[in-house]
Amino acid sequence: CMDSSGAMRTGWVRLADGWHYFASNGAQIGGWLKDGGDWYYLDPNTGVMRTEPLELGGRHYEFNASGAWRGYEAPAGYLQPTDHITGLGGDTNTLTWGMNGVKVRIVQQRLGLWHATKLASVDAAFVSAVTNFQRRAGLSPTGVVDRATWDAMDTGYPWTVDQYQATPLPLTATRHERIEALIGYAWNQTGSSYTWGGAGPYDLGFDCSGLVLQSLYAAGLDPQPITVIKHGWPDYRTSQELYAYPYFQHVPLAARQRGDLIFYRSGGIVTHVSIYLGDDMIVHTDWMGRPARMDHITASYGWANITPDVVRPLP
């Protein structure tokens, strides 16, 4: 294949019938090609890159519009995997009344309010301690931790520390690999401390749904509009949002499988979520002073308080 000057063309070349790939010696490539971490399929006869589904060797393959092989595609109507979790831009939580999460914990630690069973929530003691700090630092004594107050505290953490998001798998990952990544992320957090409204990383702790949300990210699932920032809001309950998320499959509890999300109710309202491992075991984190860990599926709630259906994020 030559360009208009007569020079040999190599790499990806777009011709009238589609994209082709030429080796360094000018030979046209056919069959499977790995480029930049992604796999592509080029018709062995024509050399044209495939974007339509392919049946080959008794296996079904799906491709993105870019031609990259997609190792798993959810059934129609369900959340599809992604290789990039939606960016948060400048979104981060200013610590006003009722706000929760890792930034609250960091300030509590900085001001001597934190202990293992302390709720990481902006309360009266928090506001009082912050107001006193602001007076000492020559700042306006609002009791609200904004960027200026945060910087003056010199916590060692960036103002956007609550933007942490787990890194997803590439699109080539299979369903099995995604299920194991979901479980594996949560498993790797066992031993981390509990932080109300927390979504990691390990040294800053998680609550139940913060752990599950990051595990979903690791598996390549981004259930927008749920985000780690909203997770810290006073009246936002990520466990309830995940249970009600319209693009997740629900199946009966009796049909539970490894990688499903188990939900629990208190007074008829969803208040807890865990990840199912199989054999009636889960991985979760549930309250202050108790680290992320493996546990029995009932998780002190009892069978009667488990919802009758589970969420299968990877159907």
Segments the model singles out, each with a brief description of its role:
Residues 1-86:
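Extracellular adhesion/carbohydrate-binding repeat motifs centered on closely spaced tryptophans
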Residues 14, 34, 106, 125-128, ...:
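Residue-level recognition of short, solvent-exposed, well-ordered loop/turn junctions
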Residues 53, 94-155, 228, 276:
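Short acidic, glycine/serine/threonine-rich helix-capping segments at coil-helix boundaries
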Residues 72-120, 164-177:
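Acidic, Ser/Thr/Pro/Gly-enriched interdomain connector segments
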Residues 109, 128-140, 147-151, 155-170, ...:
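Cysteine-nucleophile amide-bond enzymes
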Residues 158-224, 267-272, 283-285:
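N-terminal capping segments
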Residues 193-258, 303-306:
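Catalytic cysteine-centered active-site loop
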Residues 234-235, 241-252, 265-315:
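Aromatic- and glycine-rich peptidoglycan recognition patches
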